[in-house]
Amino acid sequence: MVANNAVISVTGKRFDESVGLYLAICVVPKKGLAPTPCGGGVNKSGVGEGSFWISSNPPPYGVGLADPFKPGGRFNYKIRVSQKIGKFDCKKVKCAVTVRADHLRSEDRSYDLYLPITFK
């Protein structure tokens, strides 16, 4: 269990470095659907602590916005978690630390990972 507005560490390893990922806290969707909504929104500025774009080969517009993987498909981020994601309350709906393929493979559900999170 975590407290609202807490900062948690998320570490990943052995991810496919040829596939960009998003990392965020999201409402767990119905099977087969993309995780959404997600806290932190779409991180277009490349700064912040609510969501992250991880890609070692982003398109030209993503250079400087996406963070590259560390060797071995690794990453480590600190994410600020909020009990509320838009109108959804994570005490009432299932939420998770979520990894998914980025917008270049937005329909590919094979990269989706969910680590359930509960709030105090």
Language-model segment annotations:
Residues 1-120:
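Extended, solvent-exposed regions of the mature portions of secreted/cell-surface glycoproteins
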